[in-house]
Amino acid sequence: MTERIRNVALRSKVCPAETASELIKHGDVVGTSGFTGAGYPKEVPKALAQRMEAAHDRGEKYQISLITGASTGPQLDGELAKANGVYFRSPFNTDATMRNRINAGETEYFDNHLGQVAGRAVQGNYGKFNIALVEATAITEDGGIVPTSSVGNSQTFLNLAEKVIIEVNEWQNPMLEGIHDIWDGNVSGVPTRDIVPIVRADQRVGGPVLRVNPDKIAAIVRTNDRDRNAPFAAPDETAKAIAGYLLDFFGHEVKQNRLPPSLLPLQSGVGNVANAVLEGLKEGPFENLVGYSEVIQDGMLAMLDSGRMRIASASSFSLSPEAAEEINNRMDFFRSKIILRQQDVSNSPGIIRRLGCIAMNGMIEADIYGNVNSTRVMGSKMMNGIGGSGDFARSSYLSIFLSPSTAKGGKISAIVPMAAHVDHIMQDAQIFVTEQGLADLRGLSPVQRAREIISKCAHPDYRPMLQDYFDRALKNSFGKHTPHLLTEALSWHQRFIDTGTMLPS
């Protein structure tokens, strides 16, 4: 471990996780590293959860406000949720136990745009940060903190926190050192902010390590534990069909000179649909691709390996166990092709617009006019959060939403008369793709958009119902610009809640 903690003076701060966890008090605001299940602290949260459970058994209160980069893993969100140790959570979560706490009303939750979290923290929206808890690959001779498999909001939390706890994780590959690009300009401060001088996805503008006043470092914990690295389902026929429509669209846009032959910087969400698209791009005609995204997932890693993609910039990895092992074994090959940045840079709307990114994101549902619900099932039950989809959707050159046309074995339609919750308004959604087809909505009015979405994207089981609703709304709506029948616009959702299906009996 001495080669991991190369600053001799800081070795005296090494202690067990149990001791470090005692620094975290009831009511503290704690900012941690971690983004899409990568690079989050693992041992101190487990020790903290045990202390919380013991306090609760004594009838004492012991909860914290937990602010991260994005989702973490079972050792952090899972353990603290089991202990009922979080009274407020932001900005993104995928842990099932934490999700249950949120949807039961036991943990307050706000799914902020990921690109805005650092700025909100600097502005004091989350309160005063008592603790920054970050995972590191190593600590350099001059006290620099080498991040691990994500960057997230770590630098901002280190700047703001009164005390710092560092987990130095030996499981993380030491060759991660040098892969990060931490810009030390004023990204998120007020009242003025510096322009982040990125004009190409492959550009480095900062340094390789996080910086913090060493006097703030209160504890260093040695760990050896892997990231979440959840497996991805192999793309099914539905995902492959969606990918096929999108690849044909890209080819058409190149022929029309609306896209260059190498496309534009790609942003992609995670999951089997996203991986199917990336797999298709790996086999397709486009070369010298670049990624400017928030995550690097299996499909993007495969494109880097094949040479189809030359550089990928993000804030984090989100890999299957197999892909994580692959990159660990071949880090000397991949490290020159990857840049990990803080998330208020990876998700900066200004950079996204400057680079002209192509944004590809999933959704829970969209209405017939193209308003998108990415977060709340039936309008009220939180799934994960808006993540970075809002950062990219509004500012990208192309904003694309991908989804199977149905869910729950056909019991839910992804295209509905009115979205039960809206994360992305119609002005931020240009292209919709389901396994039924692709709707290009650029330059269309709401009525024209509805005709395209219903005919191109809706499932045949639901298409006649949508067409009937739209036809009657055209005749009887209060206004004819965006026709709706308010007495039945959300009736599909209520039918599912009442009967378990959106289809009428």
Curated annotation (Swiss-Prot):
Pathway assignment reads:
Metabolic intermediate biosynthesis; acetyl-CoA biosynthesis
Which InterPro entries does the UniProt record give?
AcetylCoA_hyd_C (IPR026888), AcetylCoA_hyd_C_sf (IPR038460), ActCoA_hydro (IPR046433), ActCoA_hydro_N (IPR003702), NagB/RpiA_transferase-like (IPR037171), Succinate_CoA_transferase (IPR017821)
- Mind telling me which Pfam families this protein's record contains? AcetylCoA_hyd_C, AcetylCoA_hydro
Q: Which GO terms describe its molecular function?
A: acetate CoA-transferase activity; acetyl-CoA hydrolase activity; transferase activity
Any GO BP: acetate catabolic process
The answer to keyword NADP applying to this record is no
Q: Which UniProt keywords apply?
A: Transferase
Q: Where are the transmembrane segments?
A: none
Q: Which reaction does it catalyse?
A: succinyl-CoA + acetate = succinate + acetyl-CoA
Disulfide feature: none
The record's annotation in Gene3D superfamilies points to:
Acetyl-CoA hydrolase/transferase C-terminal domain, Glutaconate Coenzyme A-transferase
Instruction: Give the phenotype of cells or organisms lacking this gene.
Output: Cells cannot grow on acetate and have lost the resistance to high levels of acetate, a characteristic of wild-type A.aceti.
Active site per database record: E294
Induction behaviour:
Expressed at intermediate levels during the first growth phase, when ethanol is metabolized and acetic acid accumulates in the growth medium. Up-regulated during the second growth phase, when acetate is catabolized.
* EC number assigned by the record: 2.8.3.18
The top EC class is transferase
- Which residues bind CoA per the record? G269, V270, G271, N272, V273, I364, N384, G388, K408
Record text on activity regulation: Subject to competitive inhibition by coenzyme A (CoA).
Q: Does the keyword Transmembrane helix apply?
A: no
Q: Which family would the database say this protein is a member of? A: Belongs to the acetyl-CoA hydrolase/transferase family.
> Tell me, what does this protein do in biology?
Utilizes succinyl-CoA to convert toxic acetate to acetyl-CoA and succinate. Required for growth on acetic acid and for resistance to high levels of acetic acid. Also has low activity with acetoacetate as substrate.
Fill in the subunit field for this protein: Homodimer.
Could you identify this protein by its name?
Succinyl-CoA:acetate CoA-transferase
Provenance organism? Acetobacter aceti
